[in-house]
């Protein structure tokens, strides 16, 4: 047992010096101790004779010791025991080292204990250090030591001797090693003895087997020579070829049978197996068999093909029924979990979802089951969606905020309802998309023939399902929204409602709702109704205004026109605030709400207020002032919307038409004002006469005066007549003409700018005619200049000064 020798572990360990365990110290040098000299010791030792071991009276018996090692061990123990001890000498030598030791035996025992403890600690460290370079061999050594320890009683081991570091310990370990080797050899011999009968049989059968081998080689050589012989029988070859052909046909038929039929395991799985991926793999095989059966029919194997096709159809009918039940169970389980744990969507990596979608692909091949399943899903989800829709309308519900109709803000109520429906749509769309929308990465795992055949239906399945489910809410939504639209009279509110409906229609279509969906049609119908209500508000307002008795105060527009324009501009503000005009601003809008009330309703009502306008110039003048005031208010109120509401072609035309009507009325009022001034000064007849000859406004220089020479033939051109008709009126009126025009004629014109412009232009016309008429008279009557100057007492500058013009 050299492997148990402690000196074998004296190799340096990897690591720092601090980690090294202390090694046993060397024997003490007795020569270094104080005591007698070496020569004296030698003399004393030589003087003493070694005691004979065999003649001692001891209990050591060497006769029964056959083992050399045992005899040597006993001899060494006896030698140590009989060694003479000199107490004084030992005490003198070791008193500096071990002052408490009384003899050599005590010193040796204590040294052995200390050394054993140190070595045990070092051995434990070595055997348990995983970083030791010989860790694997250490593990085997540790295992061997543990086996020895477990069998210590059986082997009769003396542990104190085995671990001694001296010669006796080494001798004990070698003895133990030899004993273990003997035991190991005994075990090996016992094992080999068990194989001895087998070896005997092999040796006994070796010669017969060799003979058989030689005979078989001779037979094979003879057969090979016979095959190479030209005398081979053709009948045997023909039979052999037929046999090979039959074997080949058998293999082909077996392959066809396996490709066209289901084995017992597949049949059992199809009928009673659990719906999983392996079940669908069997269905894939059935679909391939069905496709091959059509090939058989096309290859003149009609009977076999039809029989196979009928059998496969029965299998497929059974499989479709089981898949149909599985899909329904999947949805019912989901509904049950929803009631317990709440609504949830399926994740993309859900294994059950992948199986569900694969099953749905297979079921799409059977329209009867597929349509029935879709109807059940639609019915199930519709009921759930309707219940969720009605919850907020219950005042005492505990599941969320209630939606309450307020008379002060119906648009908000309608918006809350639409927002609630949109949230239901979004949630339902996400759920159906997670359940029925096929992802690209999943399509590769599905049966491509079925998927490609029904690709259009399957890829749009979630959209169609969403439209079918949401359509069931159309009546409930219509009931709650239509009453708001029908009973609302305010134009701006109905416009807001139409805007909301149009906006949510757009949002619904972006979520996948189709234009022909019942719910979307409800939004369209209600939006049209809201727009109609908006238009009807203004048309009914105008109808009521026409029925009322016209009231004119200070030639100002009627009150209804001001109220109408306020309501109309409020609508325009709403339209400007929206992102688009939502189709309400069109030709009919401008015709009914702008053109007709302004050009027809107001002007006709104004004419009714002044029935004598065609006969009385004064009444006509007041009518013009009233119409100008009304159109001026209309144009000024609609002016800010010129670049937006009236930006299109027809709107711009309507606005320009109002401007032209206003300009026309201003021109007519200017003409009437000019005639009033001419009439007040007595020059009206002469003004008309001169204009019939040549327009007075076209006179540029004195040469043009000659064109009026023909006017002297008229009786009214005599100086006496002129003096009678003009002199007194002219001298009396001109000083007060400015005040008369501003404070009498144009007093009720609402726009100061229009009043100043009309007065200024009419005064310019009068002053121009005054100068032309006086100059023509001076030219016609050159000898009566003094008389003419007495009639026209004011010069041109004086007239302009009196009239307040430049």
Swiss-Prot record:
One of its GO terms (cellular component) is Golgi transport complex. GO terms for biological process: cytoplasm to vacuole targeting by the Cvt pathway; intra-Golgi vesicle-mediated transport. Keywords: Golgi apparatus, Membrane, Protein transport, Transport. Coiled coil: none annotated. InterPro entries: COG6, COG6_C, COG6_N. Acts as a component of the peripheral membrane COG complex that is involved in intra-Golgi protein trafficking. COG is located at the cis-Golgi, and regulates tethering of retrograde intra-Golgi vesicles and possibly a number of other membrane trafficking events. This is Conserved oligomeric Golgi complex subunit 6. The gene is COG6.
């Amino acid at each position: 047992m050299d492997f148990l020798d402690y000196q074998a572990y004296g190799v340096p360990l990897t690591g720092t010096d601090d980690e090294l365990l202390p090694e046993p110290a060397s024997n003490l040098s007795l020569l270094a101790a104080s005591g007698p000299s070496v020569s004296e010791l030698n003399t004393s030792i030589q003087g003493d004779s070694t005691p004979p071991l065999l003649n001692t009276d001891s209990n050591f018996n060497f006769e029964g010791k056959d083992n050399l090692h045992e005899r040597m061990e006993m001899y060494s123990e006896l030698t140590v025991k009989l060694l003479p001890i000199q107490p004084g000498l030992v005490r003198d030598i070791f008193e500096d080292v071990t002052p408490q030791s009384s003899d050599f035996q005590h010193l040796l025992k204590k040294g052995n204990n200390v050394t054993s403890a140190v070595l045990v600690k070092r051995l434990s460290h070595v055997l348990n250090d995983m970083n030791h370079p010989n860790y694997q061999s250490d593990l085997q050594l540790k295992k061997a030591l543990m086996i020895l320890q477990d069998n210590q009683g059986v082997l009769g081991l003396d542990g104190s001797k085995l671990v001694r570091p001296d010669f006796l310990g080494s001798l004990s370990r070698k003895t133990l090693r030899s004993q273990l080797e003997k035991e190991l050899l005994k075990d090996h011999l016992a094992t080999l003895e068990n194989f001895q009968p087998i070896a005997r049989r092999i040796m006994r059968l070796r010669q017969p087997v060799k003979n058989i081998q030689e005979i078989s080689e001779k037979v094979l050589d003879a057969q090979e020579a016979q095959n190479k012989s030209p005398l081979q029988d053709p009948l045997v070859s023909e039979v052999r070829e037929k046999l090979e052909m039959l074997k080949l046909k058998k293999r082909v038929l077996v392959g066809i049978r396996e490709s066209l039929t289901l084995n017992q395991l597949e049949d059992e799985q199809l009928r009673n197996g659990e719906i999983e991926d392996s079940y669908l793999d069997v269905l894939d095989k059935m679909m391939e068999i069905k496709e091959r059966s059509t090939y058989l029919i096309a290859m003149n194997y009609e009977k076999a093909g039809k029989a196979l096709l009928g059998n496969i159809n029965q299998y497929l009918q059974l499989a479709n029924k089981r898949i149909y039940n599985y899909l329904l169970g999947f949805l019912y389980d989901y509904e049950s979990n929803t009631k317990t744990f709440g609504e949830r969507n399926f994740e993309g990596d859900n294994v059950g979802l992948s199986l569900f979608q694969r099953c749905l692909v297979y079921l799409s091949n059977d329209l009867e089951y597929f349509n029935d399943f879709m109807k059940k899903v639609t019915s199930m989800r519709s009921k759930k969606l309707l219940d969720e829709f009605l919850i907020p309308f219950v005042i005492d519900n505990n599941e969320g905020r209630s939606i309450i109709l307020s008379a002060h803000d119906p648009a908000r109520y309608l918006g809350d309802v639409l927002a609630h429906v949109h949230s239901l749509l979004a949630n339902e769309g996400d759920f159906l998309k997670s359940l029925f929308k096929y992802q690209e990465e999943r399509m590769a795992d599905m049966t491509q023939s079925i998927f490609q055949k029904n690709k259009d239906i399957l890829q749009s399945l979630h959209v169609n399902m969403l439209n079918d489910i949401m359509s069931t809410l159309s009546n409930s939504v219509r009931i709650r929204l239509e009453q708001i639209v029908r009973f609302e009279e305010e134009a701006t509110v109905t416009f807001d409602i139409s805007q909301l409906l149009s906006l949510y229609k757009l949002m619904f279509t972006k979520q996948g709702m189709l234009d022909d969906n019942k719910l979307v049609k409800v939004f369209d119908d209600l939006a049209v109704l809201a727009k109609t209500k908006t238009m009807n508000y203004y048309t009914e307002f105008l109808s009521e205004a026409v029925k009322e008795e016209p009231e004119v105060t200070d030639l100002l527009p009627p009150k209804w026109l001001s109220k109408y324009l306020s309501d109309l501009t409020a609508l325009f503000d709403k339209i400007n605030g929206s992102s688009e005009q939502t189709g309400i601003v069109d030709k009919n809008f401008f015709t009914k709400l702008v053109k007709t009330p302004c050009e027809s309703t107001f002007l006709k009502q104004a004419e009714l207020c002044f029935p004598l306008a065609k006969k009385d110039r004064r009444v006509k003048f007041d009518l013009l002032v009233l119409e100008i005031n009304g159109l001026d208010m209309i144009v000024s109120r609609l002016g800010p919307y010129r670049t937006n509401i009236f930006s299109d072609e027809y709107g711009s035309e309507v606005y320009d038409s109002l401007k032209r009507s206003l300009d026309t009325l201003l021109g007519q009022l200017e003409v009437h004002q000019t005639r009033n001034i001419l009439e007040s000064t007595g020059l009206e007849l002469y003004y008309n006469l001169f204009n019939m000859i040549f327009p007075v406004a076209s006179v540029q220089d004195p040469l043009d005066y000659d064109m009026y020479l023909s006017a002297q033939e008229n009786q009214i051109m005599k100086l006496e007549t002129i003096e009678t008709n003009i002199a007194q009126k002219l001298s009396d009126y001109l000083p007060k003409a400015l005040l008369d025009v501003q404070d009498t004629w144009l007093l009720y014109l609402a726009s100061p700018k229009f009043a100043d412009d009309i007065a200024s232009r009419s005064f310019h016309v009068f002053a121009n005619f005054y100068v032309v008429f006086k100059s023509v008279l001076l030219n016609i009557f050159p000898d009566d200049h003094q008389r003419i100057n007495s009639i026209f007492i004011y010069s041109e500058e004086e007239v302009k000064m009196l009239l307040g013009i430049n």
